[in-house]
């Protein structure tokens, strides 16, 4: 019997939780972060479930673990953990991780105000604004984002037939826009969106293939992005992003905002240099920007893409030393359907 101890820094990004594991993470094998992610999922997934699931976490919990970088052009590597698994990239998680890591002295940047993160999805460039000991704002330049498919049909309980676009912004997103059987996220409760989303995701993954052209391990749709008209005067659009099994992102979602900008750019509604302010279900904002156009060249297809950036803020809420005790029947956590 053993008691495993994890020292965590807890916080939130624009309302969505981030648990940064600053001590106790396992040593991982692999020459890339995607390989290390696979090793973690294979042998240490109990750490993820123990820290993210009840009774130590909850349905919306997400987090990260810091590692030395696997590539010379990066300052630090990040493994993202959440209730649904280990995401290749997490926008709100990145903003929270950078904020807390800088404020707590866990990372020493080579250039003040800038960081390069080694993530399973690739290099993520960071610029941050610091006021004394506090990080006030973080802007991440994300991996290439692209529109993957348009007008995919799927049957939704209660609503009926829906058409969705699927875009990639670090994860694959089904984007539900206003149409005959769907009006606006404001017209439905969060509980309804939570009930419908996993069914849509399962049906879409069964009916269609989603494969990143360059990253073989990214091969399924994981998120549903419900759109709506903004309430905040600065925002261009509003969204409710479903992830995991029962969670609606409280932040505007970084990879979701990246995917949304890629979709709009592919349809001629955004161009390089354009700003896109995205509002969350609780009214917090991410400030997105199309940095430049690019393309993703795979063996079978070449996709027009953008390099998006996302800016937001995070706040630390406290320190947390968490035990995962082998004597505990709920050592590895649990979820309630």
Swiss-Prot record:
Q: Which residues form the active site?
A: 90, 253
Q: Which reaction does it catalyse?
A: trans-4-hydroxy-L-proline = cis-4-hydroxy-D-proline
Which Enzyme Commission number(s) are on file for it? Answer: 5.1.1.8
Specify the enzyme's EC class, one word: isomerase
Recorded superkingdom:
Bacteria
GO MF annotation list? 4-hydroxyproline epimerase activity
Q: Which InterPro entries match?
A: Pro_racemase_fam
Positions bound to substrate:
91-92, 223, 249, 254-255
One matching Pfam family is Pro_racemase
Annotated keywords: Isomerase
Q: PANTHER family from the entry?
A: TRANS-3-HYDROXY-L-PROLINE DEHYDRATASE (PTHR33442:SF1)
- Sequence similarity: Belongs to the proline racemase family.
Q: What does this protein do?
A: Catalyzes the epimerization of trans-4-hydroxy-L-proline (t4LHyp) to cis-4-hydroxy-D-proline (c4DHyp). Is likely involved in a degradation pathway that converts t4LHyp to alpha-ketoglutarate. Can also catalyze the epimerization of trans-3-hydroxy-L-proline (t3LHyp) to cis-3-hydroxy-D-proline (c3DHyp), albeit with 170-fold lower efficiency. Displays no proline racemase activity.
Put simply, this protein is called 4-hydroxyproline 2-epimerase 2
Organism of origin: Brucella anthropi (strain ATCC 49188 / DSM 6882 / CCUG 24695 / JCM 21032 / LMG 3331 / NBRC 15819 / NCTC 12168 / Alc 37) (Ochrobactrum anthropi)
């Amino acid at each position: 019997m053993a008691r495993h101890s994890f020292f965590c820094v807890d916080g939130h990004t624009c309302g969505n939780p981030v648990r940064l594991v600053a001590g106790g993470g396992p040593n991982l094998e692999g020459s890339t972060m995607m390989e290390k992610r696979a090793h973690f999922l294979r042998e240490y997934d109990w750490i993820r479930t123990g820290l993210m699931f009840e009774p130590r976490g909850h349905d919306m919990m997400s987090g990260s673990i810091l590692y030395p970088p696997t590539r010379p052009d990066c300052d630090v590597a990040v493994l993202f953990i959440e209730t649904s698994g280990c995401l290749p990239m997490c926008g709100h998680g990145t903003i929270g991780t950078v904020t807390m890591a800088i404020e707590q002295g866990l990372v020493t940047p080579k250039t003040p105000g800038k960081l390069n993160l080694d993530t399973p999805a690739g290099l993520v460039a960071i610029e941050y604004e610091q006021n004394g000991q506090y990080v006030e704002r973080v802007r991440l330049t994300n991996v290439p984002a692209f529109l993957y498919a348009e007008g995919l049909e799927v049957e939704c309980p209660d609503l009926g037939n829906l058409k969705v676009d699927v875009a990639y912004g670090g994860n694959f997103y089904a984007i539900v826009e206003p149409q005959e059987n769907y009006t606006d996220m404001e017209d439905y409760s969060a509980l309804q969106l939570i009930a419908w989303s996993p069914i849509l995701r399962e049906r879409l993954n069964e009916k269609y293939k989603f494969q990143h052209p360059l990253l073989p391990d990214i091969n399924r749709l994981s998120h549903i992005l419900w759109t709506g008209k903004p309430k905040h005067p600065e925002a261009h659009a509003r969204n409710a992003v479903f992830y995991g099994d029962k969670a609606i992102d409280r932040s505007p979602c970084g990879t979701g905002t990246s995917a949304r900008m890629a979709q709009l750019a592919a349809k001629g509604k955004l161009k390089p240099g354009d700003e896109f302010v995205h509002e969350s279900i609780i009214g917090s904002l991410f400030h997105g920007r199309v940095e430049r156009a690019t393309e993703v060249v795979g063996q079978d297809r070449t996709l027009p893409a953008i390099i998006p950036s996302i800016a937001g803020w995070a706040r630390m809420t406290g320190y947390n030393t968490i035990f995962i005790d082998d004597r505990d029947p709920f050592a590895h956590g649990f979820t309630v359907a």
